[in-house]
């Protein structure tokens, strides 16, 4: 961060020496005025070397330091298998992302594949699934993390068919919501690893109802991955929430980047899985999401949205850039429900 502040001061000094306003330098360099202002203040956490070099070149100066380079990233992967996970599409999504942005927002974080690929310095993640969010919160705290680890090892050692169903039934107890966070988090991970096809599904009452995967051995605690996850959340400026997606992005500002990966719109003739929690995400919610997308766009926020390539979604986002991408659906209770599908990446910029 000290390097960014120093370089920001250099740019401001050179700009003033050249008698240029930020608006004039923005036009010369091709870097947005608001972005330039943040760079001069040393506030942009996701700034790239190429962008700073472009500004220096526009001022007739040479950028001497090479310190603005991406630091070596931790090796991290999602701690659960999640319907709609984006591991297979990471390269495609990243190719459509803005070059620079300030904070990163992901209001439907799910398994977090894109978050771990990007590893931004400042981010805000959210999900409607409280059990999933309880896991993320355990990575923020050393004491909770250690208790989570011990609980997961206990589940591994006790695993059996009978034990699986005993743990599955826990959410039917009225006091379940009051259990310690690490217990609910460990249960969520264990069930995901031990259930059929790694499917997270709840019924209309909110009870987890996926049958056992009949596995003899279940590995819940991947030591290297979990230690890296703990280090990641410990060293970054993170905000983790469990609320409505609209509230989760209300503080996004111009220059921030929001990635929406909601429960997908469904095809009329296909079995599409969207039951991530007891609150269905139907057409009205898709419309509300599109309204939020438009408001963010009007604020100058960079936005990408993933969804199925349906007529309904294309109509909702017809005023934006719609990119069709092939994908594979990997999680479905029926084998014939998996396979090739078409998705869209909707961006509010070219």
Regions flagged by a language model, labelled:
Residues 74-88, 95, 141-259, 263-273, ...:
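SAM-dependent nucleic-acid methyltransferase catalytic core
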Residues 76-111, 116-117:
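An N-terminal domain-cap segment
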Residues 102-169:
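SAM cofactor-binding core of SAM-dependent methyltransferases
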Residues 255-336, 340-341:
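Conserved acidic-Pro-Pro-aromatic motif
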């Amino acid at each position: 961060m000290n390097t960014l502040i120093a370089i920001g001061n250099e740019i401001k000094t050179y700009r003033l020496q050249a008698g240029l306003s930020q608006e004039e330098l923005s036009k010369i360099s091709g870097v947005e005025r608001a972005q330039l202002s943040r760079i001069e203040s040393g506030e942009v956490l996701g700034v790239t070397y190429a962008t700073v070099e472009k500004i220096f070149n526009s001022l007739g100066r040479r950028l001497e330091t090479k310190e603005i380079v991406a630091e070596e990233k931790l090796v991290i992967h999602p701690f659960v298998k999640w319907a709609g996970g984006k591991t297979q599409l990471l390269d495609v999504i990243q190719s459509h992302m803005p070059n620079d942005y300030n904070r990163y927002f992901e209001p439907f974080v799910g398994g977090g594949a894109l978050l771990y690929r990007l590893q931004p310095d400042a981010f805000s993640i959210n999900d409607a699934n409280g059990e999933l969010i309880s896991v993320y919160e355990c990575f923020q705290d050393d004491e909770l993390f250690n208790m989570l680890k011990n609980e997961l090892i206990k589940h591994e050692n006790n695993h059996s068919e009978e034990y699986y169903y005993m743990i599955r039934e826990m959410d039917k107890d009225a006091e379940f919501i009051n259990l310690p966070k690490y217990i609910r988090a460990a249960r969520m991970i264990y069930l995901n690893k031990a259930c059929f096809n790694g499917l997270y599904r709840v019924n209309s009452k909110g009870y987890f109802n996926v049958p056992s995967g009949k596995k003899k051995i279940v590995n819940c605690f991947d030591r290297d991955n979990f230690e890296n996850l703990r280090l990641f959340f410990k060293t970054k400026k993170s905000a983790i929430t469990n609320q409505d997606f609209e509230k989760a992005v209300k503080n996004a500002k111009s220059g921030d980047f929001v990635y929406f990966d909601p429960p997908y719109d469904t095809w009329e003739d296909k079995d599409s899985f969207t039951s991530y929690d007891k609150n269905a995400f139907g057409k009205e919610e898709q419309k509300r999401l599109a309204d939020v997308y438009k408001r963010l766009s009007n604020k100058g926020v960079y936005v990408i949205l993933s969804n199925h390539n349906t007529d309904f979604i294309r109509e909702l986002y017809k005023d934006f850039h719609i990119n069709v991408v092939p994908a594979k659906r990997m999680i479905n209770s029926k084998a014939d429900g998996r396979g090739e599908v078409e998705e869209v990446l909707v961006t509010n910029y070219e």
